[in-house]
């Protein structure tokens, strides 16, 4: 586990160039249940310049861009094989797209709207999916049937991958920004205000596990796991991630009793995530 760098280096840059500052985007609605566990094992080390600092850089056109270290994003190998252009797949029940597996029932359309509003001309291909967002988000409308994507599945996936192919670097950064601000940042703030737990100075892998649990369970659904972990500011980073992993492993079957087919997958994932961090 590598220690977090505490200072922003002067002249911190990305492979992106930003303009005037505006207000950050609001957080997304939470998912009430986690997505299907993935058995992905590979990780992409990043499509744009990585720095040692993880956090918000600046806000542009309603998007609070961030820089996130590979250490903090370690968990994405269990989400998408570390693929910013990930399409619908069996592992997520054909419900999610992208690096952080934005679920079409919850966060996919809000993310597309944010990317489209950031640059409507460049990301015009997202408009078709946004216009049919209510249908795409409707759980009764399948994205995959009879061995192939449905019409709606094609509309959503083609729009997403078309946007990625238009500007892989920027569209990847947009995914990072949305996921960080809508999931990780919400839980970091709640841990401090709700439980008195400050993780701002902890190792990025600790933050990554917090993000992982939030990404899987939603900003509301994750909170039980943090409560059950009996966290303390006096814990070492090693003790902290061990408590988090054990909380998921020991309680996920009870919390999500209606989804027994995924219990062992979730338990194994967080056992492996603990190994990643240690």
Map each language-model feature to its residues:
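Hydrophobic helical h-region of N-terminal Sec-dependent signal peptides
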Residues: 8-16
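Cell-wall polysaccharide-cleaving catalytic domain and substrate-binding groove, primarily
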Residues: 28-197, 205-278
């Amino acid at each position: 586990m590598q220690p977090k760098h505490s200072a922003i280096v002067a002249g911190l840059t990305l492979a992106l160039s930003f303009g005037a500052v505006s207000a950050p985007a609001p957080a997304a609605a939470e998912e009430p249940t986690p997505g299907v566990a993935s058995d992905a094992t590979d990780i992409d080390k990043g499509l744009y310049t990585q720095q040692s600092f993880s956090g918000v850089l600046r806000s542009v056109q309603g998007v609070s861009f961030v820089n996130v270290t590979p250490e903090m994003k370690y968990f994405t190998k269990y989400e998408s094989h570390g693929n910013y252009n990930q399409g619908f797949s069996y592992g997520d029940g054909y419900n999610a797209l992208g690096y952080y597996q934005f679920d079409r029932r919850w966060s996919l359309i809000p993310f597309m709207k944010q990317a489209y509003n950031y640059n409507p001309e460049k990301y015009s291909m997202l408009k078709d999916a946004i216009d049919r967002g209510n249908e795409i988000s409707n759980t009764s409308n399948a994205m995959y049937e009879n061995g192939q994507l449905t019409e709606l599945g094609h509309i959503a996936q083609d729009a997403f991958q078309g946007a990625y192919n238009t500007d892989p670097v920027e569209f990847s950064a947009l995914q990072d920004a949305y996921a960080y601000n809508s999931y990780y940042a919400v839980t970091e703030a709640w841990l401090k205000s709700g439980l008195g737990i400050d993780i701002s100075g902890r190792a990025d892998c600790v933050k990554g596990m917090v993000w992982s649990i939030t990404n899987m369970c939603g900003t509301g659904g994750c909170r039980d796991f943090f409560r059950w972990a009996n966290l303390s500011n006096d814990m070492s980073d090693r003790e902290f991630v061990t408590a988090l992993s054990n909380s998921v492993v020991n309680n996920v079957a009870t919390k999500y009793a209606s989804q027994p087919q995924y219990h062992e997958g979730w338990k194994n994932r967080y056992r492996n995530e603990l190994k990643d961090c240690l």
